Amino acid sequence: MSQTHRILLLNGPNLNMLGAREPKHYGSISLESIEEKIQTLATQHNVKVECFQANSEEKLINKIHESFQQVDFILINPAAYTHTSVALRDALLAVSIPFVEIHLSNVHKREPFRHHSYFSDVAEGVICGLGAKGYEFAFLFAMDYLAKK
């Protein structure tokens, strides 16, 4: 019997404002539309995806902790926490769930403070600057990764 893989899609602060927030950097697509696309892909691949967005570090950390031994892969856009949150990094390391770091914009073409990530060196991969398509690429990478386990 084949196992149905479980993926957690985590989105950090202000991503609930996608579509209205700085379309020059983030495009005009809503987070809801991104989540719907990932759910469609999940159905096509017989995978369960839970989507979660929070504007607070505590809620994101708690969700990661709840995922321990419950989730096979995490897709995370830490948003502004990318550059500030050792706590989120530590939570991901604590649960030992492989993850991909996603950014809609190319953080390396933006302000210098956005160039550093507390996640990149411990992520399976990093996707940035590809807009909403980056979520799809991250999902497909997760499928390949899990197929090889």
UniProtKB/Swiss-Prot annotation:
Q: Which UniProt keywords apply?
A: Amino-acid biosynthesis, Aromatic amino acid biosynthesis, Lyase
**For binding substrate, which residues are annotated in this chain's numbering?**
77, 83, 90, 104-105, 114
What residues make up the catalytic site? Answer: 26, 103
Q: Which reaction does it catalyse?
A: 3-dehydroquinate = 3-dehydroshikimate + H2O
Tell me the GO molecular function terms: 3-dehydroquinate dehydratase activity
In this chain, the site described as Transition state stabilizer is at 21
Q: Enumerate the PROSITE patterns for this protein.
A: DEHYDROQUINASE_II
So what does this one do? Catalyzes a trans-dehydration via an enolate intermediate.
| HAMAP family to which the protein is assigned, alphabetical | AroQ (MF_00169)
Q: What PANTHER family does UniProt report for this protein, alphabetically?
A: CATABOLIC 3-DEHYDROQUINASE
Description of how the protein assembles with itself and partners: Homododecamer.
Query: What name is this protein filed under?
Result: 3-dehydroquinate dehydratase
Q: Which organism is it from?
A: Haemophilus influenzae (strain PittGG)
